[in-house]
């Protein structure tokens, strides 16, 4: 079982330029090297992407519902139209990400260790809740 998902992860990493629209739901991709991957319209529902390298990935209209992206490197990734409902972004690096909105983040889970792009301001309230504000770019 373990060997199967490691082999699958390596196959996906090797074809990272050809993942547009691919169904990767429930995929176990912990620590995957998917920097600059084209994941446009990919189904990543409930995928495990813990500590994955997704720098400069194209996540345009990707479905990341319930995806676990904790501690993933998503710097400079494109989130245009991406679905983040119930996704987990705890400790993720979103520095330099583009097209990420407060509306998307309202549906996601994250913590104080999550790093946001400069145009997104998260204000944590005393009761543990947060408010999101987008700066004009």
What are the functions of these language-model segments?
Residues 1-137:
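Tandem repeat scaffolds
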């Amino acid at each position: 079982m373990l060997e199967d998902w490691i082999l699958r992860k390596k196959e996906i990493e090797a074809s990272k330029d050809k993942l547009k629209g691919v169904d990767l739901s429930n995929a176990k991709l912990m620590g995957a090297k998917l920097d600059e991957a084209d994941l446009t319209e990919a189904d990543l529902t409930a995928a495990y992407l813990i500590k994955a390298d997704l720098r400069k990935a194209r996540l345009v209209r990707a479905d990341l519902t319930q995806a676990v992206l904790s501690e993933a490197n998503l710097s400079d990734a494109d989130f245009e139209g991406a679905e983040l409902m119930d996704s987990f972004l705890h400790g993720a690096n979103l520095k330099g990400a583009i097209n990420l909105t407060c509306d998307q983040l309202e549906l996601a889970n994250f913590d104080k260790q999550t790093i946001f792009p400069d145009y997104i301001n998260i204000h944590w309230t005393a009761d543990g809740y947060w408010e999101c504000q987008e700066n004009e770019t």
